[in-house]
Regions:
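Gly/Pro-rich hinge or "lid" segments in bacterial periplasmic/extracellular proteins
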Residues: 119, 124-142, 234-298, 303, ...
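Ligand-site clamp/hinge motif
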Residues: 165, 254-255, 287-340, 471, ...
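Alpha-helical secondary-structure segments
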Residues: 99, 177-184, 213-219, 225, ...
Length: 655
């Protein structure tokens, strides 16, 4: 996928794995050997060897009694989870630097919200610096304690209570208290933050109440199965001491390239942000939750450097030179034809195609239906009939992909969605019905003397091969397509400000569909949200209400299918193609679980899940000097999770 924007409720990292990638030795032609596995320290794989709450309540305020969540709190009558499996690999070791690239420097690092904050980099940084009350296990989807040790859900499913971990601390050393949760909710509701999607979500709650220093209560003002999911798993907890002076408006003004203190395992200092060039994310040595079971084997790299490389082809060359540690392969040509050079053949670079249950995103050309003639569905359908997906998949993409017909994917896809095929004749018929049948001297279609011109925004040159073919298809029928290459930052600004005709977009998938923030009519004419096409439909609005109130997963699935059908038949996107795998190439110097990513993860798992393997690193350095050394290349296609089916709902919390 090209562009990537995410409105997610979760950023889950890590996975359970018994061992790390192969422990054998491969003899080279000289008779010497190079180890292709091993690494990491000897550690127990038994989850019971790692406490859920080490040094429980040791940091509690002695003035707070047990019944108010202080030291000696028993948890009677509360829910918790002390039996979850390990997420990370216990043998992982700390240290080292992971060098990654981003195609453009973001317009803001306001990871908490606000205009133009919904970027892939911000989405990655947020859960590394900030934590929520609870988190989901990425394999079982069970709730796990995070900032809260225990929780309660009322019988009517409207009121939630959380007991905070008295040991939790912000990066500035301040303890996490109930007032921090209250202030964090109020901050997200501040209209000065200019974040309508967040306010749509958090307006479903009344103002939380701090019952004590460590117990907070919140009541939903409407029944919604996702409310517990959002409040416990999405709300980043911030220091109330700072929020007393920093409201939404001040945050937008002063925190474009500065982060508030968080409770997470990493920190981004002001000096780590080099505008236009790089962002360095640093591991904290004083992270309060480092010894908890949920973090065993995770958060291993001392530094994660995000370097700006504005050309993806250049990034590929930098990776081959060893200037970047891995490369997420978006281009099939690179995967099939170009990842076969000597360093790959010798095993110095490993390539993997990883199949798992990560949520399917949406990729396509988005129409701005607020503008003519894109408000006419006949014109939108016509342009969709001019994209020859089958030919492109075969000729350009080596049959690596399949045409996409849905906005949700998996079991949520409506099987009756239109399968729009390449059909220039039908395209011309639809254009004629819409009044585009006359032609000017240049052969262009005209209506009322105006030619049919369209500008398409894109930001990755890797898209140009198929876009130029599409441009030629449109020219043949009399449509002028202007391909406008812009930076990722500029494109994001133009799309969020609704200043476009067509835009080449890629959206990450959500574990639990949240159609409201992409398709609700109330967001259609408001900037800075994911309803970029201006979609409005009263039936969809009704279904969104029904979806929120439905606690039966099977019935929710049917609702999403109906929404999917309505949206697909509105043709607000020219949907492109999809793949059920992730392709990655990496230098053979890392330790990682056998699964590589989590069951529902992708390459963004690497910073938290993988680790520096000093033995491999030393052998790789030697092999780069000695061309006779080789390593096992391993299995390219891996299916560590088999076919586990469509993820359902959390085991606890939504009932």
């Amino acid at each position: 996928m090209r562009a990537a924007s995410y409105t997610g409720i979760l950023a889950l990292v890590g996975t359970l794995s018994a061992a790390c990638g192969g422990g054998g030795q491969a003899p080279n032609e000289q008779g010497t050997t190079a180890s292709n596995g091993g690494g990491g320290s000897s550690a127990s794989a038994d989850k019971n060897a790692y406490p859920v709450f080490p040094d429980a309540d040791s940091g509690a305020d002695p003035a707070v009694p047990a019944e108010q969540g202080g030291r000696g709190f028993t948890g009677n009558g509360w829910d918790t989870n002390s039996n979850y499996d390990l997420v990370g690999e216990p043998r992982a070791t700390k240290g080292g630097v992971l060098r990654q690239h981003i195609l453009d420097f973001p317009g803001t690092l306001r990871v908490l919200g606000g205009p133009e904050s919904n970027t892939a980099l911000n989405f990655m940084i947020k859960p590394m610096v900030y934590e929520t009350l609870l988190t989901l296990h990425p394999t079982t989807l069970q709730w796990m304690p995070q900032l809260a040790t225990h929780w309660q859900i009322s019988e009517d499913r409207l009121t939630y209570r959380f007991r905070l971990d008295p040991n939790a601390r912000f990066s500035d050393g301040q303890p996490v208290v109930a007032e921090d949760v209250v202030a964090s909710w109020a901050f997200m509701m501040d209209k000065g933050l200019q974040d309508p999607s967040s306010q749509l979500v958090y307006s479903k709650f009344d103002r939380p109440v701090a019952e004590s220093k460590y117990i907070v209560r919140v009541k939903s003002n409407q029944l919604n199965w996702r409310n517990f999911l959002y409040f416990s798993g999405d709300l980043s907890v911030l220091p109330s001491s700072l929020l007393k002076t920093v409201d939404g408006a001040r945050y937008l003004k002063e925190y474009n390239f500065k982060l508030m203190p968080g409770t997470g395992p990493y920190i981004v200092n002001d000096t780590d942000i080099v505008k236009g060039q790089s962002v360095t994310i640093r591991r904290r040595n004083d992270y309060w939750g480092a010894k908890q079971r949920r973090n065993v084997g995770l958060n291993n790299f001392d530094e994660i450097r995000q370097v700006v490389v504005r050309d993806d082809n250049l990034a590929f060359e930098m990776f081959k030179r060893g200037d970047l540690d891995h490369y997420f392969v978006n281009v099939s040509r690179q995967w099939i034809e170009e990842l076969n050079f000597p360093d790959v053949q010798r095993g110095l670079i490993q390539k993997r195609k990883i199949f798992n249950d990560s949520p399917t995103g949406t990729q396509g050309l988005a129409f701005n239906t607020r503008k003519e003639p894109w408000s006419d569905i006949r014109v939108r359908r016509a342009l969709a009939h001019l994209l020859n997906r089958e030919m492109l998949i075969q000729k350009l993409f080596y049959n690596e992909y399949v045409p996409q017909h849905t906005y949700f994917g998996g079991a949520y896809e409506n099987p009756g969605n239109p399968k729009t095929a390449y059909d220039p004749k039908r395209a011309l018929e639809l254009l004629a019905e819409a009044g585009w049948k006359e032609r000017d001297a240049q052969g262009r279609l005209v209506k009322a003397g105006r030619p049919l011109n369209v500008e398409l925004l894109y930001y990755s040159k890797t898209s140009e091969p198929f876009l130029t073919i599409y441009q030629e298809e449109l020219r043949r029928v009399g449509i002028s397509l202007n391909l406008r290459l812009v930076t990722g930052e500029t494109m994001f600004q133009l799309v969020m400000q609704r200043r476009f005709d067509l835009a080449a977009m890629g959206w990450g998938g959500l574990l639990f569909p949240n159609p409201e923030t992409s398709w609700h009519s109330s967001l259609a004419d408001v900037n800075d949200n994911n309803n970029i096409t201006g979609f409005k439909d009263t039936r969809v609005d009704e279904l969104l209400v029904a979806y929120d109130r439905e606690f039966d997963q099977a019935k929710r699935l049917e609702i999403i299918r109906e929404i999917d059908g309505i949206v697909a038949n509105a043709h607000h996107y020219i949907l492109e193609w999809d793949a059920p795998f992730h392709r990655i190439a990496y230098w053979n110097k890392f330790g990682h679980p056998d699964s590589y990513f989590t069951r529902i993860g992708d390459y963004r798992d690497m910073p938290s899940l993988w680790w520096r393997d000093q033995q491999k690193e030393a052998q790789l350095a030697q092999a780069r000097r000695d061309s006779s050394m080789t390593f096992a290349v391993g299995t390219t296609e891996v299916r560590p999770w088999g076919n586990l089916g469509e993820p359902g709902a959390p085991v606890s919390g939504t009932r």
